[in-house]
Amino acid sequence: MTELTRRNTMKLMSAALVAGVSFSSLPRKAFSAGTITVLNWQGYGTDEAWSVKAFTEKTGIAVVHDYYSSESEMLTKLRTNPGAYDLVVLNAARCAQAVAEDLLQPIDFSKVPNAATVDENLRSNPNFSKDGKGFAVPWVWGMTSLAIREGMPVPDSYAVLADPAYKGRVAMDDDAIINVAVGALMSGQDINDPKDLAAVTAALKSIKPNVKLLWSTEDQWNKSFAAKEFDLSLFWSGGSVRSKRNSKLPVQFVVPKEGGIGWVDGLGIPASAPNAEGALAFANWMIDPAFYVEWATKVGAPASSNSAALSALPTDDLSRQVHKPEYLKTMGIMSALPDDRREAFNNVWQEVKAFYAE
C-alpha cells in the first residue's frame, strides 16, 4: 500500500472490538509457544486486540508490536536491530529491496497452509521472490483505478479521462507516481518504467479540458463528489468502498482494460528472527478466512490476498464486489523507484499541473 493510502485507510478504520472469534483452521497449541514481535504500521490489522487475544489463546504465542511511520524507517529498523523482530509487514516494492539486502529469510510455505489459496498472481510477483524462493506471504492488496457516478456509461479505458463528454467533470489524484502510471497506461507503457515520458506527459495534458479538481485526501474527494463537482475520477478501491458504505455516495469503481494500478503488502520473516516458527503461525492466521471476514466486516480492511478469504465475505459485501479476483490478472503492481526516476516522474507531474493551471 502506498504510504498516503495506508494512512488514510488506518484513520478511517474503526477501533471495533469483536468478542468470541473462532479460527477453526488453527488447532490449539499447534505451534511452538513463546513470543513474537511484529513490525508494522500502527492500527493496521496485526494489532487488533480481539485477534491477538484469540491467536494467543489458540497457540500460546504472545504477540507484541513495534511500529514504523514510514517504509524507510521500517527498513532502517530491520537493518539496525538484528534479532529484534519475528514478522514484518512490508509493501511489495520494499520487499524486493529488503531481499536484496538479505534482511529477509525464505518462507517455508508448508507451515503456512492458508497460503495454498493465495492468488497466484500475487504469490508469483517478482518483488516477493528471488531464485525461485518466496520471501513474503502476500497479505492484502488494493488499487487505484476509475470511479464514476452511478448511472453513467461504464468506461473500458483510461482514455475516457480525455473524452469531451466529461468536459469539466473529471477529478485527478494529486500524486505524481499515480498520474505518471495513468499516463503510461494511456500511452501503452509500463507503469514502473515508461521509456517515453514525453508520451506520458502528452497523454496527461490531453485531459486538461476535463479537469475540474486535483484532490489529495479522501475527505476532500467525498465532499466534492457529494457536491456533484465531478462525475469521473481516479480513486482508490478501498476508498470507493468506504464512500459507498459509510457516506452513502452513488459511486461505482471500474477497472478498465489496461488494468488497475496496484499495491500489495506482504508478511516477511526477518533473516535474524528469533521465533520464525511462531511468526509463520501468525502469518497463517493473518490470511485465515475467518480472521479476514471479522476484520473486513467489523473493522474495515483492504482486499485479502487469499481468494478463499475474499470468497468467504457475504456476497453483497462491497469490498468483495470491488476487489474481484479477475482484476489481479491485469493489475500492474507498483515497484520501488530509483531516485532519478522518481524525480523524473515528479517533474512530469509538475509540468502537467502547471499546464492545467494556464
Q: What are the functions of these language-model segments?
A:
Residues 94-97, 226, 232-249:
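A ligand-binding cleft/hinge motif common to bilobed small-molecule-binding domains
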Residues 1-20:
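N-terminal secretory signal peptides and thylakoid transit peptides that target proteins
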Residues 270-330:
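Mature extracytoplasmic/periplasmic domains
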Residues 325-358:
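Conserved C-terminal helix/tail region of periplasmic/extracytoplasmic solute-binding proteins
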Residues 201-207, 247-271:
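Periplasmic-binding protein-like
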Residues 145-152, 184-186, 263-276, 283, ...:
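A bilobed periplasmic-binding-protein/Venus flytrap-type ligand-binding module shared by bacterial periplasmic
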Residues 45-48, 89-226:
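Extracytoplasmic ligand-binding site segments that recognize negatively charged/polar headgroups
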Residues 33-98:
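Early extracytoplasmic/lumenal segment of secretory-pathway proteins
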